[in-house]
Regions:
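Conserved short alpha-helical segments that host acidic/polar catalytic motifs at enzyme active sites
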Residues: 24, 32-397
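Short, often N-terminal, low-complexity regions
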Residues: 5-22
Length: 397
């Protein structure tokens, strides 16, 4: 942003790790703030939050929606969204495809493709609530599907790989159609707007899940659009991200060699595909994947006393150098049966964790945790590169 830019108000950009915003107390009522939305680059913006029950206890979306309200200034209305796990128990064996369509023609064309490759057990519009703050919405639809066994046999693919390829094909080759969620017994809900409004728009108070993640977006290098809002998902993996990764091009070039297509104009998309590649394709554990994307410095590895751990970390850094994510970031990674929270190795973005009874809370700010659970205990900030992994009790989800 040029230093000469003037917006007609006395504006001072305060940059620090916790929040960035414009001071416009006196003139706010007289100024149309919509005219500058999206024009200001706030690299430490964005808000993330998550809650999970370790025993699989269901909760509505109200709590996670409320958690975003005290972090309102971290967003600018150009993207908000949620991921919820355990919300489709009656269709838990089917892939829930959440989709945006520009028009009926694009939906019809996409359905033709789906019918040729999947058994569609249910097709319906995703219920929404009309509110003034969410406008210009596309057609928002969902399908519960299972890959046709004859197609799997002819392609010699397992169903997860087949679904992932189908998602890539739709998102890159079918004009006006976009799959923004594709997992089993989970769903992503996102839009252009503030997250607390997006939650109301999608009626998330009527859904029940054992795990929720949320994101309020402040785009740094890309436009705000429905597909670009977080979370980003592939199969049951979802990512909400606060930060700006400087390794995007190197990461993207590497991951696209394995069939992934980065088309959504954001660095967060590549993190989702990296996690899918490391966990589903390479069969790494969550801790190992964390040690790849937020790898310790070589000097830190050399100082390790445990030789087994030292050799393992050296191996991961040597084999996957192009998947090291550099630059400031904090992420919450969702999957069926758990969550993982992770900071960059220098901890250049805030992230706080708290607990109460069977629940674990994660957020950019402690205030968000206190909204979800005023009596939260064991509040702490994980160290840079320290993975916080929470799993639901086996058989409880």
């Amino acid at each position: 942003m040029s230093k000469g830019v003037h917006f007609g108000i006395d504006s001072y950009l305060y940059r620090n790790e916790r929040f960035c915003f414009f001071i416009y107390k006196q003139e706010r009522k007289a100024t149309n703030m919509n005219s500058i939305v999206g024009q200001i680059r706030i690299p430490s913006g964005c808000a993330i939050a998550a809650v999970i029950s370790k025993v699989g206890k269901k909760m509505t979306g109200e709590r996670i929606i409320d958690s975003m309200k005290p972090m309102h200034d971290r967003s600018n209305g150009l993207g908000g969204g949620f991921a919820a796990y355990g919300i489709y128990p009656e269709y838990k064996d089917f892939y829930a495809l959440h989709m945006f369509f520009n028009d009926r023609t694009s939906r019809k064309n996409c359905e033709t493709f789906l019918k040729e490759h999947f058994e569609i057990v249910k097709s319906e519009i995703i219920p929404t609530r009309k509110i003034p703050s969410i406008t210009d919405e596309p057609i928002v639809w969902r399908y519960f599907v299972a890959p046709l066994k004859s197609i799997l046999l002819s392609h010699q693919l397992d169903e997860k790989e087949f679904v992932a390829r189908a998602v890539m094909k739709i998102n890159t080759e079918m004009a006006g159609a976009y799959v923004f969620s594709s997992g089993k017994n989970m769903g992503t809900f996102k839009a252009v707007g503030f997250p607390e409004d997006v939650g109301v728009f999608y009626k998330l108070d009527e859904y029940e899940g054992y795990s929720w993640t949320a994101h309020g977006r402040y785009p740094t290098n890309t436009p705000g659009w429905w597909g670009g809002a977080h979370p980003f998902t592939l199969l049951d993996y979802s990512i909400v991200h606060n930060g700006e990764i400087s390794s995007y091009d190197a990461n993207r070039r590497f991951i696209e060699m394995f069939g992934y297509k980065c088309t959504l104009q954001t660095d967060t998309e590549v993190i989702t595909y990296i996690m899918d590649y490391l966990l589903r394709v390479q069969k790494l554990s969550l801790q190992e994947a964390a040690s790849v994307i937020a790898a310790p410095f070589w000097s830190t590895i050399a100082a390790k006393d445990n030789e087994t751990e030292k050799e393992k970390l050296k191996f991961l850094r040597t084999v996957f150098p192009s998947l090291l994510i550099t630059g400031p970031f904090s992420i919450v990674f969702g999957f069926n049966g758990g969550l993982m929270a992770l900071n960059d190795r220098l901890k250049l973005r805030s992230m706080v964790v708290g607990e109460k009874d069977d629940k674990v809370f994660i957020a950019s700010e402690e205030s968000a945790i206190r909204v979800m659970e005023p009596n939260a205990e064991q509040i702490y900030a994980p160290a840079g590169g320290e993975a916080v992994i929470v799993r639901v009790k086996e058989g409880a989800y």
